Structure formats: structure tokens, C-alpha cells
Amino acid sequence: MKNIHCINHPLIEHKLGILRAKETKPFQFRMLIDEISSFLLFEASKDFSLKEIEISTPIQKTTVKKLDEKIMICPILRAALGMLESVFKMIPDASVGFLGFVRNEETLKADFYFQKLPKDAKKRTAIVIDPMFATGGTAIDACNFLKSQGVKKIKFISILAAPQGLKKFSQMHDDVEVFVACIDEGLNEKGYIIPGLGDAGDRVFNTL
């Protein structure tokens, strides 16, 4: 699966270990999500195009580079809201396109209930963020929707992923690069990633 990138780094592994622990407090959990998301965004943005502009330093004029792509961050509600701030810190001029999915506990599928994209969404590079990439169903539906709206370039960032979900996603969207911090063992009978870290949304918002 050439479109799947698992980012290996000692600091990511260290932070993941704390993130997984059930004793980790909500404020720590949010901080770790933010930090790991920054690592992943750094990798996902390596091929962003640049343009040269002229500026004046306090000493003289010079040519510098700046992003030449319009970026749209697409958090999948609600857990991905914990990742949003880290992306904003690195790309403050990005627009946000919200995608709302709710998990059906009986079918283990996600129902699409809300979307709000920028008017110029099809002109932007979409960075979809969701901390957990489990069955792949939500990711597939999110990318299906974005493509239906004319979005040409999509990247996906997740903290943890299950191999089953990644394989299923790659069969449907091999043109979408996925960046994850860790690929776990798999899924349990309820469709949760194992060993995982529990329900990311509940841990971010302290609603356990």
C-alpha cells in the first residue's frame, strides 16, 4: 500500500505510550494529540508547492518562499477537533471544512449527518484529520464526499490505524496519502482498534 505512511520517530513512540495509558488525564491527552498531530502534518506537507516572493529584512531586500497552495482542514466530528489546533498553529491561513459522522453501534458503520465546506473547496488541498482510522468506512465516505465536491488533492492524517481499515481504504482511494503514527494489531468485535487508546472523542472531551 504505497499510499500509506507510518511515521516512525522516537518522540512519537514515547508520546503514544503516554497517550494510550488509561491513567492519562484529559488535559494531557489533548496535549499529546496536539503534539503528535504536528509531527504527522509536518510529514504530510512535505510536497506542498511553494512560490518565491520578495520581502525586505531589516537589512536588505531578499527573496523568500511561501506556500503556494490553498489548504482546507477537514476535521471529522467530533474527535478530530482535538487535532485541529495543531494544524492551525502550523498553517494559520487554512480554511476549515467540517465533516460530521456518527458511529452506528449496531452496524459499526458511520452515518454522515453534517458538512460545511468553504465555497472554494474544490480549489483547495484537503487535509482530513481523524485520530482513529479503524474500519476505514468513515475515511472512505469522507473522501467520496470531498471528491464529489470537486476536491482534487486529499491527504488523511490519523494517530492510530487498523490494518484492515487501511487495506480497505487503499482499494477505494489509492490516490489519497494516509499518514499515521502507528498501525495497531487490528479490530475487536466492536470495531475498536486494539490495543488502541479507547474512545478518542470521549478522552479528548472528558465524557467517559
UniProtKB/Swiss-Prot annotation:
UniProt: uracil binding residues: I193, G198, D199, A200
GO MF, one example: magnesium ion binding
Cofactor: Mg(2+)
EC number: 2.4.2.9
Keywords linked to the UniProt accession: Allosteric enzyme, Glycosyltransferase, GTP-binding, Magnesium, Nucleotide-binding, Transferase
Pathway, per record: Pyrimidine metabolism; UMP biosynthesis via salvage pathway; UMP from uracil: step 1/1
Residues that coordinate or bind 5-phospho-alpha-D-ribose 1-diphosphate: R78, R103, D130, P131, M132, F133, A134, T135, G136, G137, T138, D199
InterPro entries in the record: PRibTrfase_dom (IPR000836), PRTase-like (IPR029057), Upp_B (IPR034332), UPRTase/APRTase (IPR050054), Ura_phspho_trans (IPR005765)
GO BP: any one term: uracil salvage
Reactions the enzyme catalyzes: UMP + diphosphate = 5-phospho-alpha-D-ribose 1-diphosphate + uracil
Pfam families hit by this protein: UPRTase
Bound cofactor: record note: Binds 1 Mg(2+) ion per subunit. The magnesium is bound as Mg-PRPP.
Inhibition and activation profile: Allosterically activated by GTP.
NCBIfam families referenced in this protein's UniProt entry, alphabetically: PRK00129.1 (NF001097), upp (TIGR01091)
Family: Belongs to the UPRTase family.
Reported function: Catalyzes the conversion of uracil and 5-phospho-alpha-D-ribose 1-diphosphate (PRPP) to UMP and diphosphate.
Record-given protein name: Uracil phosphoribosyltransferase
Organism, scientific name: Campylobacter jejuni subsp. jejuni serotype O:2 (strain ATCC 700819 / NCTC 11168)
